[in-house]
């Protein structure tokens, strides 16, 4: 049955504008706004709209995804046009290219959903959240993967009980819980259904929120007794100036002075803080940085690009200058970025993209992977598992290093995206990783968001974005494993995929 409100929503003059409006509101559920309560309402309204016009389910889902991802990732245009100087003739269509691809996943979800002939309560209340989560997982994994904008990230805030599921099953379990909450709200608010049918989703909503709240109070990792002070350097180097030859010395001087101003145990510089290949630097530069830190009793990590050991490529690295020896350049401990950004750090289609790179004047666009098995870097009394840039958007890939680490660290340069929401969305992903892995996460960035995050995902300290500053604070080393660290996302997702297949098998057999 259809309520009076639904009759209005069904009308094409309202249906399509409402669909676009709901999708365009999704950015407000994520950082920096953190209106977490809005996402289940948006998701529920979106599902209800599709229920009203099921014939347009796939096209509606695609339009919703296209609108949501375009409004969330508008900062692609900032990187292409404002920073790289690409004319709007190229920048505008290229900005839509990623959202147009990502929108295929919501469309796939509802294409699969239409294949199920099931009672409404099961089809909406059980199967749809499962399919949505599975397609979100596929979006994070297929090709190079891009998990930004998963609805679970909207719940990574101190106020949402659903964030409590992160240490159990990662961000995808939070996504599943968010989708469940959205569709159960639809079923619970259906005033055309019998009161008995509305009672069950109300009970499920209460149970879900209670379970999330309880999970949030549970600790799986523990302090190992070590305490450290950290200093996270934010140079605020304009991206349009960063790689200019006449800016190299001023940039190095700026970071050298910042290192000299802190006596923290651990000092971390951002991604590619020194805009010169390590092997091309005069050897005394790194020696001076190491000496400056040593004089202040600090261990120092520096973001810098370097040639690979075979000399045939280059890596995006963080080098550990603790115990640096000028005559042993090849013995410097380092972490090299492994999950590279397609079209940004390597060229998947060089015959098509090389002319574009020349127009954009992009430096260092063909990095090599650092490899999946890299050890934590020992700095003072902490073993630090580093990741660089958007690597902390892939939780499963951080598990192996985190098991042997007491602290997580991200080095980034978000200056590509100006003063947009990109830095805050990235910060929220780091909050999720801290919760999933049960450890402090520290972030050293060029322009923001430089921050210290607790194992509960709370932002303890944050530097003012777009300023030259040093953020100092205290952290504790943590050990132990969360349930998520033991299984990752794949195993329990395979379980719910099996459940979905079992539901389809049972009900099809009943029909026959």
UniProtKB/Swiss-Prot annotation:
The keyword Methyltransferase does not apply. Its main location: membrane. The active site is at residues 271, 337, 389. The chain crosses the membrane at residues 5-25, 56-76, 92-112, 118-138, 168-188, 195-215, 487-507. Keywords: Acyltransferase, Cell inner membrane, Cell membrane, Membrane, Transferase, Transmembrane, Transmembrane helix. PROSITE patterns: CN_HYDROLASE. Residues 233-477 form the CN hydrolase domain. It is an enzyme of class 2 (transferase). GO terms for molecular function: N-acyltransferase activity. The keyword Chloroplast does not apply. It is a multi-pass membrane protein. It is found in: Cell inner membrane. It holds the Pfam family LNT_N. One of its GO terms (biological process) is lipoprotein biosynthetic process. Its EC number is 2.3.1.269. One of its GO terms (cellular component) is plasma membrane. Belongs to the CN hydrolase family. Apolipoprotein N-acyltransferase subfamily. Catalyzes the phospholipid dependent N-acylation of the N-terminal cysteine of apolipoprotein, the last step in lipoprotein maturation. This is Apolipoprotein N-acyltransferase. It comes from Neisseria meningitidis serogroup A / serotype 4A (strain DSM 15465 / Z2491). The lineage of its organism: Bacteria, Pseudomonadati, Pseudomonadota, Betaproteobacteria, Neisseriales. The gene is lnt.
């Amino acid at each position: 049955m259809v309520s009076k409100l639904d009759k209005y929503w069904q009308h094409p003059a309202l249906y399509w504008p409402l669909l676009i409006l709901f999708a365009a509101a999704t950015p407000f559920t994520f950082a920096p706004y953190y209106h977490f309560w809005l996402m289940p309402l948006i998701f529920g309204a979106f599902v209800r709209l599709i229920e009203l016009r099921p014939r347009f389910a796939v096209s509606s889902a695609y339009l919703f995804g296209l609108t949501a991802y375009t409004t969330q990732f508008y900062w692609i245009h900032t990187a292409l046009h404002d920073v790289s100087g690409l004319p709007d003739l190229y920048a505008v269509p290229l900005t839509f290219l990623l959202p147009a691809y990502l929108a295929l996943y919501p469309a796939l979800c509802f294409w699969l959903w239409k294949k199920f002939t099931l009672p409404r309560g099961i089809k909406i209340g059980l199967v749809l959240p499962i399919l949505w989560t599975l397609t979100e997982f596929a979006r994070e994994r297929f090709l190079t993967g891009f998990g930004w904008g998963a609805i679970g990230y909207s719940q990574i805030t101190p106020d949402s009980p659903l964030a409590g599921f992160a240490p159990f099953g990662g961000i995808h379990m939070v996504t599943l819980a968010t989708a469940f909450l959205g569709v159960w709200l639809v079923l619970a608010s259906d005033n055309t259904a019998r009161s008995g049918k509305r009672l069950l989703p109300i009970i499920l909503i209460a149970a879900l929120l209670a379970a999330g709240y309880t999970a949030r109070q549970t600790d799986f990792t523990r302090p190992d007794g070590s305490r450290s002070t950290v200093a996270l350097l934010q140079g605020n180097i304009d991206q349009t100036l960063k790689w200019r030859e006449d800016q190299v010395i001023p940039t190095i001087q700026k970071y050298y002075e910042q290192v000299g101003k802190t006596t923290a145990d651990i000092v971390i510089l951002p991604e590619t803080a020194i805009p010169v290949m390590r092997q091309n630097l005069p050897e005394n530069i790194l020696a001076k940085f190491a000496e400056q830190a040593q004089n202040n009793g600090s261990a120092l990590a520096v973001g810098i690009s370097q040639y690979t050991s075979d000399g045939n490529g280059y890596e995006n690295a963080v080098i550990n200058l603790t115990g640096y020896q000028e005559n042993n350049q090849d013995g410097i401990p380092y972490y090299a970025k492994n999950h590279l950004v397609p079209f940004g750090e390597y060229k998947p289609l060089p015959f098509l993209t090389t002319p574009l790179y020349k127009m954009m004047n992009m430096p260092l666009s063909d990095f090599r992977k650092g490899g999946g098995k890299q050890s934590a870097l020992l700095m003072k009394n902490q073993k630090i598992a580093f990741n660089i840039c958007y690597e902390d958007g892939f939780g499963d890939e951080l598990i192996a290093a985190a098991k042997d680490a007491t602290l997580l660290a991200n080095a980034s340069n978000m200056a590509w995206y100006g003063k947009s929401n990109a830095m805050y969305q990235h910060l929220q992903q780091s909050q999720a990783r801290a919760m999933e892995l049960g450890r402090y996460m520290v972030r050293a960035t060029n322009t923001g968001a430089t921050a210290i995050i607790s194992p509960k995902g709370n932002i303890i300290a944050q530097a003012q974005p777009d300023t030259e500053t040093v953020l100092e604070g205290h952290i504790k080393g943590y050990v132990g494993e969360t349930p998520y660290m033991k299984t990752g996302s794949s195993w329990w997702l395979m379980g719910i995929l099996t459940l979905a297949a079992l539901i389809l098998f049972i009900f099809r057999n009943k029909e026959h």
